[in-house]
């Protein structure tokens, strides 16, 4: 599942900085103002509203689950860490909403522009309607470029990792 929620996340260099940012957020300071003061220079998350799903691999699963399960919008009283490219960053978050009806349009837009989702949907329908290729040129092209679409030949659809 994608566990969507909308949050303002601030990426900090370490836990000590994140602790200061969390205190400022709890004191009522605007997340973008807190971010400008405490975020790491190369931050992906800078206090702006962001749709968070399980597709986001640069933040911890624990944060995604916490945002998804929290009942009330506001500052999440916890510091999250995640190692990214050999560097450990600390994050603080403010939940904007995790109510599906409030973010469904954004979730729809995000998922419909995701190549993995598009591919999975196409494969689903190709299987459902027993897609077969009888033209050798088309078959060869699909075999070379998109073997997962050859659903009638699952032996070819496997990736060669």
What are the residue ranges of the model-derived segments?
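PPIase-associated folding chaperone regions across multiple families
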Residues: 1-20, 36, 58-161
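Residue-level recognition of short, well-ordered coil/turn positions
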Residues: 29-30, 72
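Intrinsically disordered or highly flexible coil/loop and linker segments, enriched in small
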Residues: 30-31, 44, 131
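Short, well-ordered alpha-helical segments enriched in acidic and aromatic residues
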Residues: 31-41
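Gly/Pro- and small hydrophobic-enriched strand-loop and loop-to-helix capping segments
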Residues: 40-48
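Extracellular C-terminal loop/segment signatures of secreted glycoproteins
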Residues: 48-57
